[in-house]
Amino acid sequence: MVSDQARHLRGLVEQHQQWGTGSDTSGAAALSIAVTSGKGGVGTSSIALNLAIALGQLNVRAALIDASLGLGHIDLMCGLNGYWNLEHVLAGSRRLDDVTLDGPSGIHVVPGGGAMTARLPITDSDAFDTPRSPGHDTVRQLVALEANHDVLLLDASGAGHPFVFHPGGGTNIVILVTTPEPTSLADAYATIKSLPRHVDTRLMILVNRVESARKAGELYQRLLQTTRLFLESEPTLAGWIPDDPEVGQAIRQRTPLLIQAENSPAARAISQLASRLLYQTPRDPEAPGVFQRLYLQDTRAQEAA
């Protein structure tokens, strides 16, 4: 049975359909969310995948790009096997439509190219040598992908990810995943310290694999006090995800958590996070998307050079 909350959220989504419709590159852009971390092994990819599915279950048109700088395996985590990936798009041997997979709950999944992601046009000005270069063509395809979705999620795993640290600003929201481990918290602080200043990006902290809301709140407050004191930065708390054995089981079985164990504590927490992101993120329908904005910045810089 569909809950009253889900019905209400679907109504909210209908109001936000102006975010992005049509196939041209001039329409309203998708809400862009990068899920990142200061270190590996904190569950970033699993969270990005299941967050996309949670949005899909709310009838949100969601696309997930595996932009991990490591070995991208988002497709394998949801039982797919994409032979073609972003690396082939960047090389010009495949179109973005060719490599995009139909994922669970109506989401679209773009398999990653690993370290090749660092060559995406918005991160590599050399990709813009000529108007007909692979960089120009790739970014036009990415802009079209944005225009055809309401929410664009990026698994931005990997320290210093260019989507997160671009000096011109990146996605609308950056969700920084951390765990209670001291090394994870230290890496989260280092990530915040390295973020570009004065950009219109909302930074949110998500505490993963934690035993309770109280513990998550304590960890967040500790991190917040440090960033306030030394960085004059105040990230908000996105929420917390409990330590749940179902997460590892789902990964081993190559089935997303929200499909295999939708009523598990971690799955419910991710669904609630998706709901909050929709409620709490007003969008300017005239604002350009992340790819369109950074593409324009880089091309203008080249024209002025």
Q: Which residues does each predicted region cover?
A:
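Short gly/ser/thr-rich secondary-structure transition/capping motifs
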Residues: Q15-Q17, L90-S93, P134-H136, L153-G158
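Walker A/P-loop phosphate-binding motif and the immediately C-terminal alpha-helix
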Residues: T25-G70, I74
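Flexible glycine-/small-residue-rich
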Residues: S37, D66, P111-G114, A156, ...
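P-loop/Walker-type NTP enzyme "switch/lid" segment
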Residues: L64-A147, E246-P256
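Conserved catalytic-core segment of NTP-binding enzymes
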Residues: D137, V151-D243, Q249
